Amino acid sequence: MSKRYRQWVEEYQDQAWTVARYILKDAQEAEDATQEAFVKLWNNQDKIDPERIRPWLMKVTRNGCLDRLRRRRDNVEFDESHMAGEASGPLQGASANETGVWLKRAITGLKEPYRSLVVLRDVKQHSYEEVAGMLELSLAQVKTYLHRARKQLREQLAEVRP
């Protein structure tokens, strides 16, 4: 293993795993996705600009996770009526835990890249610049997509809590 590659693994492994974990919602699957991303890095290390390793790796990790979600969705049918039944009713008087559960479901229900952006920016509290770098989006895209994602969350809240 080259010294340069070993340094990249040490420097970016935790960040890649964090991105994978929040997209996939499964620690073991996130570990597998992270390993796959680093295998791709190993196979392409001579083709990648060393100054762009982090954004390249975060994008490969994200795309690999999205592929896994697509495969998972193809294999398991999602029961929307069950989710809707659990989340019905006003949130007024709901405990913080119930509100947290509702919010987690709402975030999970967002499509990519909205879900990743909300998790990285609002939950993990990364800066806009860090999120842009991780997902290889422009700063303007990050802000626009976050605005849309938050609007969707507000609309969902308004449906549950008039």
Residue ranges and their predicted role:
Residues W8, Y12, A16, A37, ...:
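Residue-level preference for hydrophobic side chains embedded in well-ordered alpha helices
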Residues K59-D79, A96:
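Arg/Lys-rich amphipathic alpha helix in sigma70-family domain 2
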Residues S81-T108:
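Acidic, proline/glycine-rich intrinsically disordered inter-domain spacer in sigma factors
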Residues M1-T18, Q28-E31, W42:
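A short, charge-rich alpha-helical start-of-domain segment used by transcription regulators
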Residues Q28, E129, A140:
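Residues within helix-turn-helix
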Residues L117-R121:
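A short pre-motif secondary-structure segment
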Residues L135-E159:
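DNA-recognition helix of helix-turn-helix
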Residues D32-V39, N43, E51-N63:
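Structural recognition of an alpha-helix C-terminal capping motif at a helix-to-coil junction
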